[in-house]
Amino acid sequence: MYVIELALRMSPVPVSVQRKEAEAAEALYQQIRQALESGQPRLLELTCEKVEGKKVTLLISEVLAVQLYEKTAATGGSKRPGFSFDS
């Protein structure tokens, strides 16, 4: 399972959706990245392959960052990949 996580302006909690295949996750990551660069489309609707019926629509101008990672048992529940200032 692959997680696409988005950091939103003025929100401490990221929005995430999941994809079963690496190719689908990479395609969504690139779609979001391109939308961030161009500002189009203005709204972006995302769905989740793990949770049936989970949908979210985001205003692309409020997305600050996007991250893609593979979800494994090693990532656990509270520690997500990314950049950390902790040793």
Swiss-Prot record:
Native source species: Parasynechococcus marenigrum (strain WH8102)
InterPro entries recorded: UPF0367
Taxonomic lineage: Bacteria, Bacillati, Cyanobacteriota, Cyanophyceae, Synechococcales
Family: Belongs to the UPF0367 family.
Protein name per the record: UPF0367 protein SYNW2233
